[in-house]
Amino acid sequence: MKTKLSMVAAALLLSVVATGTCHAQQTPLAVKIPFAFQAGDHTLPAGEYRVESTITGSGTIQRLSQANGEAVMFLVTMPVESRYGHANPELVFNCYGQTKFLSQIWTGDREGRQLYKSDREKQISVGERGREFALVLHPTDVKQ
């Protein structure tokens, strides 16, 4: 009886994990970013990038890579919700002077991903008030 109960519990857990993983997988976004920016602790040049979600046991990691395959990085994120939703995918940047930090990734629905602030962004933001802007990706800009 105890063995059957353990097997049922394991099967239930596996189905929940598999369902969550399948549900959370998203189509990768390919986007052209027209300016240099910071992502995590790295400075990246303007160019074409691909953003993909990778599901882990502790949360979602965003995989950011250049279209030419040169730079690949993994960014730890947390969920962020919008009351209004985002009709189109968009990337949100925090701007301090000429320095732009990738802050949020929205795939065109009510739930997006918030990046944790890097040490550099925390340091810059102490003495300077930043502004936020979104790079809205229209359906013609999004390559899937």
Residue spans for each PLM region:
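Short polybasic amphipathic segments
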Residues: 35, 60-65, 102-105
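Beta-strand-rich cores of mature extracytoplasmic or soluble domains
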Residues: 77-144
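Bacterial N-terminal signal peptides
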Residues: 9-17
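Short, solvent-exposed cationic patches
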Residues: 11, 58-76
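Short N-terminal segments immediately surrounding and downstream of signal-peptide cleavage
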Residues: 26-42
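Sec/Tat signal peptide C-region and signal peptidase I cleavage site
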Residues: 19-24
